[in-house]
Regions:
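N-terminal signal peptide
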Residues: 15-23
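Positively charged n-region of N-terminal signal peptides that target proteins for export
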Residues: 1-8
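Cysteine-dependent hydrolase recognition
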Residues: 23-619
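Bacterial N-terminal signal peptides
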Residues: 8-16
């Protein structure tokens, strides 16, 4: 067999490996991967062809570029690991000329769901290139975050391509075997304490600190050691020397120091927007600037949780230091490096006045001192016309919600689906009854409303759930509400700032958690446009089961990872499930960089207590 060698030498700090063998040189370890692939299987798809390869567990799916079979491998290693070399050996390269071009990956669905076939299957400039695509036989991405044991680790995602495509010749180049050898050395420099002085860090403006003492006492009564720190103490350097160019960066550096000095795992940010015409904040926010669908900036609380980059250094989200964070302008490329894996479990209580904070604190205490009914309420309909995307008139909302039910087999289920009933606040309220642990709504959204369609009825909206419906929710048990849709957790709106819906003093998600005598204990949704993936493009999540794209990618997949973390990974705390969703989505869709996937990762926000024991403590 003819062997072609590729050798890359570098010194990088890596994430996520499985140790396969130990190198002969002291202190060095190896990861060895040996994968066999079948001859490409060709199938006709109208005027295009599709490729499949046995041994490839997913596909490279970049809009406007050929869909290429791909094998992904994820590994975990200790924080600070140095990669010394990566060597790839491939078998003899064979070629095959195709009758038709390989089908391009579909363009992202527009938020309104209305696209024509020409827009969806637009071929990018790669189809006029003479270069092979992908540009090499393998690629990788690295990141730093928390593993399932709450330990700081680094993650490596390898992508191996058994097929490469020359569009000008309409010819594929393929291999039947690839061997990768990664030599690395674990670092002796571990910045984290062996034992945690505090589990939970509460950061707050001074004006809210007195009220939060009751929450600190409650948390410590259940063994969650808690430190309450005010923003003034951060800015004055009372605990650590002040670092950072502006207030959000000073806070982020403080969180980094708290991790390394106190062993913090959970971070609760307290404070939302200050009431008024001009936008001011009790607790600062970070706007990021990934352009997509006419949205040029939006809030991402993930900024405060993504502390370390792939080198184990501070991750600023502003690589060029120009003060524009997460920069990817409409006609440019990604400027700033972002790791995207959370390094703490983080949530926010977006209270605007003391009265609202009291409501949230009392609800948390009542919730954790109770044991909730194992019940979930689900609602969804037909979100998109999926036929142009290769679908079969699937009802995406129901598919995603039904998948959620699979992860919670011992839960009572109450479904509000079309056509069995109208999707309305009244029917959702009836399904909720006295309460539940979870509520999952999957459809379309705005800051003040969630809704969807009946089957094939895309010109008419269901009544759904509107902010003016919330005063009538008097459930005694408060669910964690996951709201799938655009801007469903946009918490910066006001009567003078509401670009994606009707003016309102506050949004749907944060109104749910400040509702007195009902509503939610926490919400998860999006501060921006997430990406939707109707139709069928192959096994996008690489689990070996080809399902509709709405459960394998996009905002449906993000929400399902949250429920998978709770139901299948036995994660007990709310912030752990949020972290699992973000990290798992990042594993699959960070590379290659896509504006829409970064939007989805950035925007998925937890409004609630990350240290919340899901379902309560009491038996």
């Amino acid at each position: 067999m003819k062997i072609i060698q590729y050798f890359v030498v570098f010194a990088l700090i890596f994430s996520s490996f499985t140790i396969v063998s130990i190198g002969q040189e002291a202190g060095k370890k190896e990861i060895i991967i040996d994968i066999d692939f079948s001859v490409p299987i060709i199938s006709e798809d109208k005027s295009f062809v599709n490729l499949d390869v046995i041994g490839a567990n997913t596909c490279l799916n970049e809009p406007g570029k050929p869909i290429i079979p791909m094998c992904t491998k994820n590994y975990v290693v200790s924080f600070g690991t140095i990669i010394e070399s990566v060597k790839c050996e491939i078998s003899e390269i064979k070629t095959m000329t195709l009758k038709n071009e390989i089908k391009p990956a579909q363009q992202p669905v527009k938020p309104d769901g209305k696209s024509d076939n020409r827009e969806i299957l637009t071929k990018g400039s790669i189809y006029q290139s003479e270069e092979l695509f992908p540009y090499d036989w393998f690629s990788y991405s690295i990141g730093a975050g928390l593993d399932e044991n709450n330990e700081h680790k680094m993650f490596l995602t390898l992508q191996i391509f058994p097929v490469r495509y020359n569009t000008s010749e309409n010819k594929i180049y393929y291999i039947d075997n690839a061997k990768l050898k990664i030599v690395y050395k674990e670092s002796d420099n571990n910045p984290f304490p062996t034992t945690s002085e505090y589990n939970l860090l509460i950061l707050t403006p001074t004006k809210f600190s007195k009220q939060l003492e009751k929450l600190v006492e409650h948390k410590e009564s259940f063994g969650i050691s808690t430190n309450l720190v005010t923003l003034d103490e951060i800015y004055n350097g009372d605990y650590f020397p002040v670092e950072g160019r502006d207030d959000p960066e000073k806070i982020k550096y403080f969180i980094k120091n708290s991790i390394e000095e106190w062993g913090i795992k959970y971070v609760l940010l307290v404070g939302g927007r200050i009431p008024g015409i001009k936008e001011k904040w009790h607790f600062p926010v970070r706007y990021v600037h990934i352009w997509a669908w006419d949205e040029s900036s939006y809030i991402s609380d993930l900024y405060f949780a993504d502390i370390y980059d792939s080198y184990g250094d501070f991750c600023s989200w502003d690589s060029n230091g120009n003060g524009v964070y997460g920069e990817w302008l409409e006609n440019g490329s990604l400027v700033d490096d972002m790791d995207l894996y959370p390094d703490v479990y983080l949530g926010r209580l977006p209270c605007r006045v003391k009265f609202e904070l009291n409501i949230m604190i009392n609800k948390i205490i009542k919730y954790e001192n109770s044991k909730l009914t194992k019940k979930i309420v689900l609602s969804g309909g037909d979100n998109f016309d999926d036929k142009p995307y290769g679908g079969n008139d699937e009802k995406e909302g129901e598919l995603v919600c039904n998948k959620t039910m699979e992860y919670l087999p011992d839960f009572e289920k109450e479904c509000v689906y079309t056509p069995q009933m109208d999707i309305s606040a009244r029917n959702i309220r009836r399904a909720l009854g006295k309460g539940a642990i979870f509520m999952h709504l999957h459809g379309h959204g705005s800051p003040t409303r969630w809704t969807t369609h009946k089957l094939l009825n895309y010109d008419e909206w269901e009544d759904g759930l509107f902010i003016l419906d919330l005063p009538l929710f008097f459930n005694k048990q408060y669910p964690i509400v996951v709201i799938g849709g655009c801007h469903t957790s946009m918490f910066n709106i006001s009567m003078t700032n509401s670009p994606w819906g009707m003016p309102s003093f506050r949004g749907l998600s944060d109104w749910l958690i400040v509702k007195v005598g009902g509503g939610a204990i926490a919400t998860l949704g999006y501060t921006c446009f997430p990406v939707a993936t109707p139709g069928e493009s192959g096994d996008l999540d690489g689990n070996g089961i080809n399902e509709p794209d709405c459960v394998e990618s996009g905002y449906g997949y993000m929400q399902l990872r949250f429920f998978y973390g709770y139901g299948e990974q036995d994660l007990d705390y709310l912030g752990e499930c949020w972290n699992f969703a973000i990290a798992n989505y990042t594993d699959h869709f960070k590379i290659p960089y896509e504006r829409t996937h970064i939007h989805t990762i950035h925007g998925f926000v937890l409004l609630g207590d990350p240290s919340l024991m899901i379902g309560g403590y009491e038996e």
